[in-house]
Amino acid sequence: PSMLAVEDYLFSLSWLRSIGGLSAMINRCDKNAKVIFNFIDEHDWVSNLSSRLDTRSNTSVCLVFNDRRIENPNEFANNVCFRLESEGVAFDIKSYRDAPPGLRIWCGGTVETRDVESLMPWIKWAFESEISLLNSS
């Protein structure tokens, strides 16, 4: 590997140590995921892809839209993702190709909780915008 890659690795380890190590990283992941789990609890049109609490990820949180008005879930999820990307607030947020249509939000320890908190109103806006288009047709 190049010396830049080695230096980047050393810098990352130093940063990790400075915030409290592994337990701090796990705590950051838990806090980030909790923001999304709370959002899900507050909105009946979205749910966690995993219905089992013991299999939910705290790093790659996957959401599905469960509103009955959505006739084409894949198209709807694509449109929500496109809206978010067009506004510059979320990139590469679409669920994996082989997963059910929805959103995939990275909540790893390098993500700031305030950024996850800032994303939630945008997801609500994109959802409501797309639903309003369904209602108008």
Listing of model-derived features with the role each one plays in the protein:
Residues L53-S60, Y96-R104:
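Small/polar glycine-rich anion-binding or flexible loop at a beta-alpha turn
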Residues F82-D92, I123-I131:
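A common structural junction motif
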Residues I19-G20, H43-L49, I131-S136:
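Surface-exposed helix-capping loop/turn segments at secondary-structure junctions
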Residues R97-S137:
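PLP-dependent enzyme catalytic core of the Aspartate aminotransferase-like
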Residues P1-F39, R52:
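Active-site C-terminal subdomain of aminotransferase-like
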Residues K34, S47-L84:
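Conserved PLP-binding catalytic core of the aspartate aminotransferase-like
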Residues V46-S50, V89-S95:
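A short linear hydrophobic-aromatic micro-motif
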Residues P1, K94, G108:
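Glycine- and other small-residue-rich loops at beta-strand/loop junctions that grip anionic moieties
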